[in-house]
């Protein structure tokens, strides 16, 4: 296969969904049918190939996204299996950043669940073309048509139904392919490897005709020539329909919807065909955004094998046999083991040691990789998640990833003082792997504090510390990660001088602090940031080389706010004026001046305390509704919606995280164990003043 041609044959896809929708099972079946896995792993038996960390096998949930390469027809499919639990949203986010397409798996019984919405929004953010697989069609209560309606209503997406289920619940036996207008039926033996095309059953003919007409109405809109043909009553060919479905999927005009039961081995091969037929190759994506290091110019770089090398490091993982592995997605050029590249974010050279193609937890050594490939590199010293690796002569920085702020924190200490150093090493390794996990030291108590996206997230970190690094730790009570912000703009003019003998220090800064939501001309790339710095210095009032000192000072000092010492977020600092001294000024002097300006200026901005608000969804039988709503209200919750789902009710509410500790036990006792809930971080909001007073008093 020629190198250029190879790009057309690659599909980089993610499989993402709500917890328990059947992602890992679907991926397992894909590996089985593409010949990469000789035994089907079952999640509920703890044997799934993709779930390879011990905790995943025990809990039956996928925690880290394992990358796997397999082949179908003449195509190479790189699959990233992503976690569906809300505490691991960061894993989904970073996978989506490097993928070209995704398969969203939905539970045929539950339909679109809260995490499905979150993942969908993340995929929207990165413009990832995707298709939908309605799984678990063999389960009691599965309803394909309701699921399609939910995709429309809840996700605001345009579903294009290309398959219909044949049989329902335990009688589910196959699908109707609306492109070929044939039924595909699985016989129960041979693990679903054998299936047969048949005529559409008589009792489904009308339904198939109805959905075929809907399909054609949607796809012909994309091509005037085919539309004319269709409207004049001519036959639209299978090939034409496939091309239009592909074009519409890649341009996100609609999302193809397929169905099946991965657990019962039905519907997986047509899903693979659809991945190959309809999801984009790297060539279809065409470009990647980045910046030329030499000129500082932002531009679109072509995804091509003939361009100089560039790649994005999207995951770091500790492998018990190889050590630290850095997963990269190559966007342009090629790379060979032993070559030197540059990390353009840190300006450090890296030498490529071993290069591996990963299959869940098995690895294959390779000597060369090129644009479109997803590979793991061993032996990189300075590269972390989100960094760019680039050709040394033609340096580029690819668009960075954004990582959410942690919402929960705990104090940890080793059970024996001998383990103190080991614990420090373990936590720094784990933080390098996971950018949504942070480690810091409390300056007042000297305690080590770990911060993450939820209780399960931190539980698993502590578990990994015990298993992988043999460190036993005592843990404190979970604490909410409060934040501070300002609510009005203020200006401060501060001069720092120290000129009492010896080398002096002098720096004057004039800074405007303002709430981000009040900034009129905020650039697109700053819209998701929690702190924005801008210099509007003209005429050299502050020399260019001192301005980074101002930004560094503000970045450091904002970690301890002025109300209760929590980090300050959601504000912009604009350096508008200043002064310097030829001899006594330095970067350090401007750093000190910026810190002092912050301390003096922030109290004038009417600072407020913020708390994380969680979107909580409770699914409960009717009879417990009253008690559950009453309890959510008592937790300062705001009910957003109440919807029937089957014979249950779904209550959605926004509730402060501080009020949600121990909720699982309360819900169990309120509903005799019949209700379930999920929660996900929504936003930060101001803390009511009486609650803020209690928080300040505790600090």
From Swiss-Prot:
Belongs to the TRAFAC class translation factor GTPase superfamily. Classic translation factor GTPase family. EF-G/EF-2 subfamily. GO terms for biological process: ribosome disassembly. One of its GO terms (cellular component) is cytoplasm. The keyword GTP-binding applies. Residues 8-283 form the tr-type G domain. This is Elongation factor G. Catalyzes the GTP-dependent ribosomal translocation step during translation elongation. During this step, the ribosome changes from the pre-translocational (PRE) to the post-translocational (POST) state as the newly formed A-site-bound peptidyl-tRNA and P-site-bound deacylated tRNA move to the P and E sites, respectively. Catalyzes the coordinated movement of the two tRNA molecules, the mRNA and conformational changes in the ribosome. GO terms for molecular function: GTP binding; GTPase activity; translation elongation factor activity. Gene3D superfamilies: 3.30.230.10, 3.30.70.240, Elongation Factor G (Translational Gtpase), domain 3, P-loop containing nucleotide triphosphate hydrolases, Translation factors. HAMAP family: EF_G_EF_2_B (MF_00054_B). PROSITE patterns: G_TR_1, G_TR_2. The keyword Protein biosynthesis applies. It comes from Rickettsia helvetica. Disulfide bonds: none annotated. It is found in: Cytoplasm. Keywords: Cytoplasm, Elongation factor, GTP-binding, Nucleotide-binding, Protein biosynthesis. Pfam families: EF-G_D2, EFG_C, EFG_III, EFG_IV, GTP_EFTU. The gene is fusA.
